[in-house]
């Protein structure tokens, strides 16, 4: 019974990877739109996009960590 609950919890924790993928797509979609509207701010926009990518990717890295914690620690 407990092993099944652990597997369900680990699976639910990895759903965050899909959300992170959507978030990264939104970050770079916004970058393309902003550069198309104002090309003179391309370098500044790219810096902000990389920051947004890094923060979004951090969530994607926390998801498998939580899944492994659920499976092997608790």
UniProtKB/Swiss-Prot annotation:
The chain crosses the membrane at residues 8-28, 50-70. Signal peptide: none annotated. CDD domains: ATP-synt_Fo_c_ATP5G3. It comes from the Eukaryota. It is a multi-pass membrane protein. GO terms for cellular component: mitochondrial membrane; proton-transporting ATP synthase complex; proton-transporting two-sector ATPase complex, proton-transporting domain. Keywords: ATP-binding, CF(0), Hydrogen ion transport, Ion transport, Lipid-binding, Membrane, Mitochondrion, Nucleotide-binding, Transmembrane, Transmembrane helix, Transport. One of its GO terms (molecular function) is lipid binding. Its main location: mitochondrion. It is found in: Mitochondrion membrane. GO terms for biological process: proton motive force-driven ATP synthesis. This is ATP synthase subunit 9, mitochondrial. The gene is ATP9.
